[in-house]
Amino acid sequence: MSRKPLIAGNWKMNLNHYEAIALVQKIAFSLPDKYYDRVDVAVIPPFTDLRSVQTLVDGDKLRLTYGAQDLSPHDSGAYTGDVSGAFLAKLGCSYVVVGHSERRTYHNEDDALVAAKAATALKHGLTPIVCIGEHLDVREAGNHVAHNIEQLRGSLAGLLAEQIGSVVIAYEPVWAIGTGRVASAADAQEVCAAIRKELASLASPRIADTVRVLYGGSVNAKNVGDIVAQDDVDGGLVGGASLDGEHFATLAAIAAGGPLP
């Protein structure tokens, strides 16, 4: 099955709302509309930027979509500092990242919490981008495939087969995030193919064939072409390279098979 690539730019804790507007405008200017027929493009700004991004996207009728970097597993209530899926849906978000390695590492989030957040996202009509990935010691020990499959199972626990069909999976080897090191295209394919095989077991082969599996970890315009050319890699979760509007647009154009005439 042909799956439309998704290029999602995770801004992490960068850019205030004024800077967010400038970056989205730069991306929109640098990536002509014709590319959006071949690639879905999303930005994932900090919470404080979302309303500004929504206003710009809606006002200028941009084909760019956007999402949030996290959400609460709770719908509302006395959870100081949490942001609910309902709030994100009202802000027009299409996606929400759950289980990013930085959340797992710095906030001690485990698979059970990630699964709860994914379920909450789906409940509110958001597409969760469920992140999994291994540290360098696991990779060097040759246990990277088994590690990712175990993390995948835990992070999707409790979801029905049809719900699994509504998620995006992002494979992000932790040792490649922000380091300049990048898994080879073959490395990415190995794990992403194993992920798809496990999705077929958890849901069905039909559903597994529809789920987009992204690669994340020092993705840039130089390597994205080789990565998305792999059979089971359907795009990228882009970090630092997404903060440069022109570079990010170039990256998305390559993922679309461009440059287009």
UniProtKB/Swiss-Prot annotation:
Pathways per UniProt: Carbohydrate biosynthesis; gluconeogenesis; Carbohydrate degradation; glycolysis; D-glyceraldehyde 3-phosphate from glycerone phosphate: step 1/1
Coiled-coil parts of chain: none
This enzyme's EC code(s): 5.3.1.1
Main location: cytoplasm
UniProt note: pH dependence: Optimum pH is 7.
Active-site residues, record numbering mapped to chain: 100 (electrophile), 172 (proton acceptor)
Gene Ontology terms: biological process: gluconeogenesis; glyceraldehyde-3-phosphate biosynthetic process; glycerol catabolic process; glycolytic process
Entry-linked Gene3D superfamilies: Aldolase class I
Protein name as it appears in the record: Triosephosphate isomerase
Species this chain originates from: Mycobacterium tuberculosis (strain ATCC 25618 / H37Rv)
Organism taxonomic ancestry: Bacteria, Bacillati, Actinomycetota, Actinomycetes, Mycobacteriales
